[in-house]
């Protein structure tokens, strides 16, 4: 199984120190828009596509042949790294199509957007080799309309430039920004050369129920919350086990209290995506009962899909 390179969280203090250290000796950052698709590794020897979990994607046959042809243009390289994506579709639509087992011809709208590849060179060189090969595909391939694209990449000189470009990516409908440092080869692990930058929203939702921790009776697993327009969803609070136990013991008294939820965005159905509970707002007449003391950073997205 080929393991992809995974990103660090840009907002963590350790990440900031790593980036500052890099900037002392280097004067170039690379950024790409963060796509909201399905992360895949494409094997250049076989044309096969594999999700991060190692599961093969078998219902996008329109891509397999072109991956093989791409491999012929860059002999000696093992794989390319990207996402199954279409900027006109949201993630739920993409996921539904990629998971389809019937009517797979309908998946031809799914494109392969590539942002990196295997190799011992630094990112700038890997990216150049990849883009040149992709640009040759329409001439090389028998397919007139290729479904493989290179993700737009920008070389920038400062973090101010990076954050300005991040704002542009968000305005253009992307999920965020991938920041790449330019001093290491491709790494099949969570790497200190790759960082994801995302914006978050905090909103309050009414607690209407609860779920016990699976395999750990007596501890809260998640709250069920409502948004006031008919949607309910589960949110796991980012607190210590001790406080999850207290939440479970006090679960009845917490009904109708407000849970502050941090999330990336809402789905087309209006449900927050990747929600994390960060605080409970009690009646203002009462003293705050719990200090959240998260056991995971509330900005940590390392458990999120793909990266």
Which residue ranges define each predicted feature?
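Amphipathic alpha-helical
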Residues: 1, 152-201, 212
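Covalent nucleotidyltransferase
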Residues: 19-143, 306-307
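Short, well-ordered loop/turn elements at secondary-structure boundaries
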Residues: 24-27, 35-38, 108-109, 171-174, ...
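Charged, flexible boundary elements
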Residues: 1-25, 31
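Acidic carboxylate-rich catalytic motifs and surrounding loops in phosphoryl-/glycosyl-chemistry enzymes
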Residues: 145-160, 263-265
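Short, motif-level signal for alpha-helix interfacial/capping segments enriched in acidic residues
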Residues: 13-20, 93-99, 156-163
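Classical nucleotidyltransferase
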Residues: 32, 38-82, 186-307
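Short, structured patches in soluble enzyme cores that scaffold and shape functional sites
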Residues: 82-84, 114-119, 134, 152-155, ...
């Amino acid at each position: 199984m080929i393991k992809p390179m995974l990103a660090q969280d840009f907002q963590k203090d350790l990440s900031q120190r790593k980036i500052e250290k890099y900037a002392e000796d280097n004067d170039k950052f690379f950024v790409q828009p963060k796509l909201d698709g399905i992360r895949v590794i494409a094997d250049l020897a076989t044309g096969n596509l594999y999700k991060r979990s190692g599961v093969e994607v078998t219902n996008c046959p329109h891509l397999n042949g072109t991956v093989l042809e791409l491999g012929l243009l860059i002999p000696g390289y093992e794989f390319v790294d990207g996402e199954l994506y279409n900027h006109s579709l949201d993630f739920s639509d993409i996921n539904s199509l990629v998971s389809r087992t019937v009517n797979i011809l309908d998946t031809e709208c799914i494109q392969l957007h590539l942002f990196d590849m295997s190799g011992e060179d630094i990112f700038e060189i890997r990216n150049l080799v990849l883009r040149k090969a992709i640009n040759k595909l329409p001439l090389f391939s028998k397919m007139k309309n290729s479904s493989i694209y290179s993700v737009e990449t920008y070389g920038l000189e400062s973090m101010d430039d990076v954050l300005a470009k991040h704002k542009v990516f968000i305005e253009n409908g992307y999920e965020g920004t991938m920041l790449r440092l330019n001093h290491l080869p491709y790494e099949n692990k969570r790497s200190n050369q790759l960082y994801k930058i995302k914006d978050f929203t905090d909103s309050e939702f009414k607690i209407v129920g609860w779920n016990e921790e699976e395999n750990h009776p007596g501890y809260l697993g998640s709250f069920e919350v409502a948004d006031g327009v008919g949607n309910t969803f589960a949110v796991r609070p980012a607190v210590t086990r001790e406080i999850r136990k207290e939440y479970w013991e006090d679960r009845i008294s917490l009904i109708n209290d407000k849970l502050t939820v941090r999330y990336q965005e809402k789905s087309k159905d209006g449900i927050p995506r990747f929600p994390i509970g960060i605080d409970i707002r009690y009646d203002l007449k009462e003293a705050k009962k719990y200090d959240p003391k998260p056991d995971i950073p509330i900005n940590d997205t390392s458990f999120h899909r793909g990266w």
